Swiss-Prot record:
InterPro entries: Peptidase_S54_rhomboid_dom, Peptidase_S54_rhomboid_met, Rhomboid-like_sf, Rhomboid_IM_Serine_Proteases
Transmembrane segments: 71-91, 127-147, 158-178, 182-202, 211-231, 244-264, 277-297
Residues in the signal sequence: none
Organism: Mus musculus
The protein's name in its UniProt record: Rhomboid-related protein 2
Biased composition (Basic and acidic residues): 16-38
PANTHER family associated with the record: RHOMBOID-RELATED PROTEIN, RHOMBOID-RELATED PROTEIN 2
Disordered as annotated region, ranges: 1-38
GO biological process: proteolysis
C-alpha cells in the first residue's frame, strides 16, 4: 500500500510539472508585465509574425511583442499624403479627378527638374499624387504592408527604408529621366515591397511555404498594375496632362532589395553591427554622390 501511495504521489507530481511546463505563453508574459493586451492584440501579433518573420525568430517577437510605440510613421505619412491630395483635388479643383491635371506641377512639393536647387523637392514629391488610382494604390500598399512591418521592426527602421526609397527615386529620375517631373510615394512603397520581397525569397521555406507563392504572385500583380499606370502617365498621358517620371519605382525597389532587405532581416540583431548594413549604406551613398555630381555638372536640365 505504501508503495502504491508513493507511486500515486509521484504521478501527481509529474502531472503538476507537465502542467507547469505547458503554462500558456501568454500567462508567462503577463507575469512579466508583457502581453497585457491579450487576447485580441496577441492574435494580431501572431498573424503578423507568420507573414513578416521566418520561423526561427517568431517566438522572440511574440515574447516581446507590444503596440508601444504604435505604427505611427506609416499612419502619419499616409495621412499627410491624403491631406495633400485632398487639397489639390478638392480645394483646388482640377479638370479631372481620376488623373489630376497640370495643377500639381505648380506645387512647391513636386519634384521639377528646373527647380532642383530647392532640395526639399527630392523628398517632398512623395506627398503629391497624380490621381485617385495613383494615391489609392500607394496608400493601400503602404498600409497593408507597412503597418505590419512597423509592428515588427518599429518606426525608425521602416522610416529609414521608406525614405531611402523616396530619395533614391528622385535621384534616379534626375539621371534617367532628367527632363520630367516626379510625384507620388511609389519610391518609398517599392522600397518596402523590395525589402519584404527579398526576405520572402531568402527565407521562402521558413515563411509559411504554402502561402509563399501566393504572396509573391500578389506582389508581382501589384507591381505590374502600378508600373502600367506609371508608364501610362509617362508615355500616353493626354496632351493637356502632366507626364511624370516612373524611374522612382525601379530605384525604390532596388533600395528596398539592398537596404530594406538588410534592415528587415536583422529583427533580432543589432543593425549597426551587421556588415551587410554598412555595405548597403556605402553603395547607397556612392550612388547618391554620383547623382549629386551628375545634377551639378552633367544634367541636360542645367
Amino acid at each position: 500500500m505504501a508503495v502504491a501511495h508513493e507511486m500515486e504521489m509521484e504521478s501527481v507530481n509529474l502531472n503538476m510539472e507537465r502542467e507547469g511546463k505547458e503554462e500558456p505563453e501568454e500567462e508567462k508574459m503577463k507575469g512579466n508585465g508583457e502581453g497585457k493586451d491579450f487576447p485580441r492584440s496577441r492574435k494580431v501579433h501572431r498573424i503578423v509574425s507568420k507573414w513578416m518573420l521566418p520561423e526561427p525568430v517568431r517566438r522572440t517577437y511574440l515574447e516581446r511583442a507590444n503596440c508601444l510605440p504604435p505604427p505611427l510613421f506609416i499612419i502619419l505619412i499616409s495621412l499627410a499624403e491624403l491631406a495633400v491630395f485632398i487639397y489639390y483635388a478638392v480645394w483646388k479643383p482640377q479638370k479631372q479627378w481620376i488623373t489630376l491635371d497640370t495643377g500639381i506641377l505648380e506645387s512647391p512639393l513636386t519634384y521639377c527638374p528646373e527647380k532642383r536647387e530647392e532640395a526639399w523637392r527630392f523628398i517632398s514629391y512623395m506627398l503629391v499624387h497624380a490621381g485617385v488610382q495613383h494615391i489609392v494604390g500607394n496608400l493601400l500598399m503602404q498600409i497593408v504592408l507597412g503597418i505590419p512591418l512597423e509592428m515588427v521592426h518599429k518606426g525608425l527602421r521602416v522610416g529609414l527604408v521608406y525614405l531611402a526609397g523616396v530619395l533614391a527615386g528622385s535621384l534616379a529620375s534626375s539621371i534617367f529621366d532628367p527632363l520630367k517631373s516626379l510625384v507620388g510615394a511609389s519610391g518609398g512603397v517599392y522600397a518596402l515591397m523590395g525589402g519584404y520581397f527579398m526576405n520572402v525569397i531568402v527565407n521562402f521555406r521558413e515563411m509559411i511555404p504554402a502561402f509563399g507563392i501566393v504572396r509573391l504572385l500578389v506582389i508581382i500583380l501589384i507591381v505590374a498594375s502600378d508600373m502600367g499606370f506609371a508608364l501610362y502617365r509617362r508615355f500616353f498621358v493626354p496632351a493637356n496632362g502632366s507626364p511624370v517620371s516612373f524611374a522612382a519605382h525601379i530605384a525604390g525597389g532596388f533600395a528596398g532589395m539592398s537596404i530594406g532587405y538588410t534592415v528587415f532581416s536583422c529583427f533580432d540583431k543589432t543593425l549597426l553591427k551587421d556588415p551587410r548594413f554598412w555595405i548597403a549604406i556605402a553603395a547607397y551613398v556612392a550612388c547618391l554622390l554620383f547623382a549629386v555630381f551628375f545634377n551639378i555638372f552633367l544634367s541636360p536640365a542645367n
